[in-house]
Amino acid sequence: MGRGSVTSLAPGFRFHPTDEELVRYYLKRKICNKPFKFDAISVTDVYKSEPWDLPDKSRLKSRDLEWYFFSMLDKKYRNGSKTNRATEMGYWKTTGKDREILNGSKVVGMKKTLVYHKGRAPRGERTNWVMHEYRLVDQDLDKTGVHQDAFVLCRIFQKSGSGPKNGEQYGAPFVEEEWEEEDDMTFVPDQEDLGSEDHVYVHMDDIDQKSENFVVYDAIPIPLNFIHGESSNNVETNYSDSINYIQQTGNYMDSGGYFEQPAESYEKDQKPIIRDRDGSLQNEGIGCGVQDKHSETLQSSDNIFGTDTSCYNDFPVESNYLIGEAFLDPNSNLLENDGLYLETNDLSSTQQDGFDFEDYLTFFDETFDPSQLMGNEDVFFDQEELFQEVETKELEKEETSRSKHVVEEKEKDEASCSKQVDADATEFEPDYKYPLLKKASHMLGAIPAPLANASEFPTKDAAIRLHAAQSSGSVHVTAGMITISDSNMGWSYGKNENLDLILSLGLVQGNTAPEKSGNSSAWAMLIFMCFWVLLLSVSFKVSILVSSR
């Protein structure tokens, strides 16, 4: 058996599917006439060949001791159900019952075990050749009219001896001579060969080499105050010098060691240069609404370059500052060259209109009212509303002062009239003279007074509801009588009067004692009875002992 077939497998690779895979995949696809990804099972008439002749008919070229075949069933009678399994030199005899092949709880096939016997039945000689015959069971195919008995799958192997050989391996033993390296084997190319054929890697020498498309220009000097990140649109750049060296080519330029963009993309990114009537270049405004001495000639009737009220010295002005607050100019705090780092010359330079830190510290003084900043959606306060608020406050003060004078005059009139009234009538003076008495009377009026007659007591049901509404504590507060007399009080009128103050206060013990006393008395009676029973039993015992002697 050679290894020239395309289906030969390397050592360690074996065709060893499970029973379910043989039925659900291989046998079903064969019956439905569908192709296989790996054609490892050949079609032959197993029941017309001897078992020792079948290994040569296998599609898998290996020395394994098991083989797989598709075979058609040969009926013994045309109209019968029995199968003819007789060969020229023997026959295949069924042993045991058919076993079900399950896919979960569903039956997908049947498995039959057969043993080859030499000779004729029933006197044939049993051999070690065994066959497992797999048959498909699919209800869906029955509904479509597919004949499932057209093919069966046979697994044939030879045992090492008589009797059951459970767990026996049927793989071929390894022979090293069969797998020696041959001259016609294909080798994988090395990494060096891959690198020489495919130019995938870039060396450092390739980067140093300059292409012919690169032109070096060293005529443009680099300014002393050059900062990385500055564009050619800076106001301080001399356009008349730099524009003479801009070449209209598609190549890259190297100006002093700095690679720049091509001319096409450079023209797209470059902003237009404004010239006046004399031909001189105009500086480009970086802010909004910049006015220059030469820009007056470019203004039209629409004043397209007019100064915007929302900008101040090329910077947008925040519109949420207060009137009268110091406005800070951003240009006064910036460096001259608009650099992002600090130079030694900047430390020595002094600014005339710099920000005073003391003004910042004294900003939140006592006169500052933060409420003015809240509650108004307008950016600027309306001066007329402020004046109206001041006038309304003054009018309110005048009205309050007038009302005070009217009240004082009224009190004086009432005081003069009270002199002519009897001494008993002084107790019924208005409450606003004595705020303390007014509060005390309200507080004492909320306390319920004790009931005078028995008829005023609530009924039994009302009392139960009243006690249920109260708290479950053992102490309750009821009304009592406390009288304070002969207390002289000095009023603003210079009179000495007697003041009677009545307070109601009292403590009542909760009604928990009867329940406790009732429970304790019951326990006492029970203990007393037990004691007497014990005493009588002891005396009875003693009397029995004495009488026995």
UniProtKB/Swiss-Prot annotation:
Biological process terms in GO annotation: drought recovery; leaf senescence; positive regulation of DNA-templated transcription; regulation of reactive oxygen species metabolic process
Q: Does the keyword Repressor apply?
A: yes
Keywords tagged on the record: Activator, DNA-binding, Endoplasmic reticulum, Membrane, Nucleus, Repressor, Stress response, Transcription, Transcription regulation, Transmembrane, Transmembrane helix
Protein's UniProt keywords contain Transcription regulation: yes
**Descriptive protein name:** NAC domain-containing protein 53
Q: What is known of its domains?
A: The NAC domain includes a DNA binding domain and a dimerization domain.
| Gene Ontology MF annotations | DNA-binding transcription factor activity; transcription cis-regulatory region binding
Q: In which tissues is it expressed?
A: Expressed in roots, rosette leaves, cauline leaves, shoot apex and stems.
One GO term of the cellular component aspect?
cytoplasm
Tell me where it resides: Endoplasmic reticulum membrane; Nucleus
Q: Name the segments for region: Disordered.
A: 395-418
Q: Report the gene name.
A: NAC053
Instruction: Give start-end positions of Basic and acidic residues composition bias.
Output: 395-416
Domain of life per record:
Eukaryota
Q: How does it sit in the membrane?
A: Single-pass membrane protein
Q: Transmembrane ranges? A: 526-546
Upon gene disruption, the observed phenotype is: Delayed leaf senescence and enhanced drought resistance. Enhanced heat resistance.
Return the Pfam families for the record. Answer: NAM
